[in-house]
Amino acid sequence: MLTLLHNAGEEVWPAVQQRLEIGFNHEQQHQELLLTDIKLNLSTNPLRPAYRSDLHQTPKASAPHQHWIVFPGGVHEIGHQDDCFAYDNEKPRHRTYLNPFRLASRPVTNGEYLAFMADGGYGNPGFWLSDGWSTVKRLHWSSPLYWELIEGEWWQFTLGGPRKLNLEEPICHVSYYEAEAYATWAGKRLPTEAEWEIAARGLPVAGNLRDSGYLHPAAAMPGDGLLQMYGDVWEHTASPYQPYPGFRPAAGALGEYNGKFMCSQMVLRGGSCVTAADHIRASYRNFFYPHERWQFQGFRLAEDA
């Protein structure tokens, strides 16, 4: 690599620089995925070992009362527009029409999700999409991934080992199917990815990201406006992972980076507690299959205004 950088002439430097940027950002993605894989693998060990016993405990705070932030409808532009790096799936920038909507001030908490469970959430097909209900029955889901009921108390497995469930923390490790079922139960819906991006625009990229040292979602701190838009949990949206209007994959191997995955997956936004702060942005599109829940993923609610 050093030889390549030293010998790269002006005529090839733009192509070299492009590939280096993609490589660095791809490495950040793998650093995040390594943590999610480590957690999944350790959770299958009967001894429930900790990845790190020195992780900071999340603050024992009470999540602020949920309120609703109103956003106007109309024609909005979404997608990446700056000169800094972005993946091809964030482009091209384009216009989209939105009706007025309201977005919850924070993600749904563990305690709020427990109310859904107590009301028979995992046993009522009326809350679930057909494929979601089939998944619940086939995989015998009755709670989020890593939750375990021990002597009448809920525990969850973390990268720091097993911990008692903190009801104030954002719900985590739930699939799109579970998020959609909760929203139906609550009489709300999930935001579209365009709604999420419009809401996040102008907010600083700050929060409980990997550098916080928790490697676990934390309860929201008191504040006005939207909270926890970045970090803590990747937020499910109602949007399927599709190419933006005018998207064209690059030629060669670089064109396979995102385009070939634009099928049967759902978009998540905002990063998580294991995402690098300099890796995330308002236009960033993550994507997973609707049944997957090993990633640090949660959700917030939306409704029509």
Predicted regions and their residues:
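Short proline/glycine-enriched turn/loop segments at secondary-structure junctions
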Residues: 255-259, 286-293
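Acidic interhelical loop/turn segments
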Residues: 1-24, 210
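Short, structured beta-strand segments at or near domain termini in extracellular proteins/domains
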Residues: 294-305
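Functional-site microenvironments in short loops/helix caps that host divalent-cation chemistry
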Residues: 23, 29, 33, 37-59, ...
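Acyl/amide activation-and-transfer machinery of modular secondary-metabolite enzymes
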Residues: 93-99
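Acidic-aromatic/histidine active-site loop/patch
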Residues: 109
